[in-house]
């Protein structure tokens, strides 16, 4: 029983890690929190690229 629970926990842990990697790749290498902060900036087209917030991205 403990082995099954351990496998389920390991699967969930790996799944969460994979989702984080995919989201990071989609957001040009920026964390989800940084992307949210960039979107709150008061500029024309805020975005996050290479770990920094930029204005005017297309």
Swiss-Prot record:
It comes from the Eukaryota. Expressed by the venom gland. One of its GO terms (cellular component) is extracellular region. Keywords: Disulfide bond, Secreted, Signal, Toxin. It is found in: Secreted. GO terms for molecular function: toxin activity. Contains 4 disulfide bonds. Its main location: secreted. Residues 1-18 form the signal peptide. Belongs to the scoloptoxin-14 family. This is U-scoloptoxin(14)-Sa1a. It comes from Scolopendra alternans. The lineage of its organism: Eukaryota, Metazoa, Ecdysozoa, Arthropoda, Myriapoda.
């Amino acid at each position: 029983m403990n082995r099954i629970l351990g496998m389920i926990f390991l699967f969930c842990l790996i799944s969460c890690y994979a989702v984080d990697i995919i989201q990071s790749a989609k957001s040009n290498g920026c964390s989800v929190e940084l992307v949210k902060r960039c979107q709150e900036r008061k500029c024309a087209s805020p975005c996050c690229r290479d770990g920094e917030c930029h204005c005017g991205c297309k």
